[in-house]
Amino acid sequence: MQTDLRGRNFISDMDFSKEEIETVLDVAHTLKRERALGIGHPLLRDKALAMLFFFTSTRTRSSFEAGMAQLGGHAAFIDHETTQISHGDTGKEIGEIFGRYYDGIAIRQCDWDIGNGYINSVADASRAPVLNMQCDIYHPFQILADLMTIFEKVGDPRGKTINVSWAYASSYQKPISVPQSLILQMTRFGMNVRLTHPPEYKLMPDIVQQAKDNVGQHGGSFEILDDFDAGFEGADILYPKSWGALLTTDDDEKSAQIGSQYTDW
């Protein structure tokens, strides 16, 4: 079992090796079982986590706050608008300040072409580990939860087919971080991963290449489809998700026009 995780940042899905991810999931299963049995596990007593949000959140905020409480620690919710960031505090300054006050820093910053760089700038200046609660490129913790659910529901995921399909939504251009993290992590576990989307909703080329490289190392397969029905055919796991056409346009109006062509997805 790989346990050399103390003090490590988790910003990209690839920051932890496959073996380290398996260790995290093993511990998570144990803690979930203990909680179901009423067994306390205050492993983070007297520890404090800063949760800095630039975007609203329901599930991520709730899960981090509940998790810290169940582990005996405290999660401090910090809306960026209530800080001095708007008055000039940089990522470096936030890293230096929060890194002194807190035992860990978790950040959600999803602005396109900004979020990941900001989180890394905080991490570079912080003496405490930095966790990515979603940026413009990755959403690693959500995908860990998804992977845990897959293990619980279907067992060993090797050889199972998952279809990650774009889904129409009339709201704003959502980040591409969820599908990108999905194809990165699922291809490390020997799954047959399908990415199904209209032509305008491509993901970042380097992320796609990493997913292909993972298949070469871990087995399984990876394919990109633009046929909605073909993506679902014979799949064991379905993962519909809306994301923006950000590699085609960052203009919200143009994005809405593109999306209106695919309301049946």
Predicted segments with their positions:
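Short, contiguous pre-domain boundary segments
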Residues: 3-9
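Short, flexible coil/linker segments at domain boundaries that flank nucleotide/cofactor-interacting
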Residues: 5, 44-46, 157-159
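Short, well-ordered alpha-helix to beta-strand connector turns
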Residues: 28, 102, 234-235
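Glycine-rich phosphate/diphosphate-binding loop of Rossmann-like nucleotide-binding domains
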Residues: 54-66, 152-241, 248
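Glycine/threonine-rich flexible loop motifs
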Residues: 116, 171-176, 245-265
